């Protein structure tokens, strides 16, 4: 799960860093371990999806959490038109899987190679006056705090945390 001697580059290779550690969790338990290990070792943490941003926002000399393998659909509710998905899921893979359940995202950005987390946290948007950015489609989230605890938030429960978490 953690690699040694680290180098990370974004997709365009115009941003790179040498973090002290890279974690690649595949489930919530490993993700939580990654954050708690960083806390224990007084390391800063940055999370990345596909690295499809041109900016240096993902760069760190602390711990980098690579979410590319944290990419499963956990549940689908066609009656509510809702899906629960791990944030490393690429949009290019999410769309056809939603289609298999008779669902689709109401709005997509221009880049399908982004992860769900990247598209949401960077304010990715499509077109049209009636469509918000992808973050407006998020109705609930599980957030790991700086203390290493999981907090659930939604538009009903802790709505301020949800709004802060989705475009960050």
Report residues per predicted region.
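N-terminal regions that are enriched for targeting/export leaders
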Residues: 2-12
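Short coil/turn linker and secondary-structure boundary residues
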Residues: 6, 26, 89, 156-157
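Broad hydrophobic/π-residue packing in well-ordered secondary structure
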Residues: 10, 91, 161-164
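Glycine-rich N-terminal segment of FAD-binding domains in flavoprotein oxidoreductases
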Residues: 16-110, 123-128
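Short secondary-structure boundary/hinge segments and terminal tails
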Residues: 55-57, 115-118, 132
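Short, acidic, Ser/Thr-enriched surface-loop or helix-capping motifs
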Residues: 78, 115, 145
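An acidic, phosphate/nucleotide-engaging active-site surface
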Residues: 93, 115-117, 139
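FAD-binding subdomain of flavoenzyme oxidoreductases
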Residues: 107, 119-168
């Amino acid at each position: 799960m953690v690699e040694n001697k680290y180098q990370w580059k974004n997709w365009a290779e115009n941003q790179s860093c040498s973090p002290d550690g890279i974690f690649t969790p595949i489930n919530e338990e490993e993700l939580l371990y990654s954050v708690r290990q960083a806390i224990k070792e007084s390391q800063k943490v940055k999370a990345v999806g596909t690295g499809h941003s041109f900016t240096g926002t993902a760069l760190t000399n602390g711990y980098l959490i690579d979410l590319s393998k944290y990419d499963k659909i956990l549940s689908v509710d066609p009656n509510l038109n809702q899906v629960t998905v791990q944030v490393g899921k690429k949009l290019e893979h999410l769309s056809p899987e939603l289609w298999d359940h008779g669902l689709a995202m109401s709005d997509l950005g221009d880049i399908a190679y982004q992860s769900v987390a990247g598209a949401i946290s960077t304010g990715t948007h499509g077109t049209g006056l009636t469509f918000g950015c992808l973050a407006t489609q998020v109705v609930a989230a599980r957030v790991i705090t700086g203390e290493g605890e999981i907090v659930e938030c939604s538009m009903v429960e802790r709505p301020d945390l949800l709004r802060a978490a989705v475009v960050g």
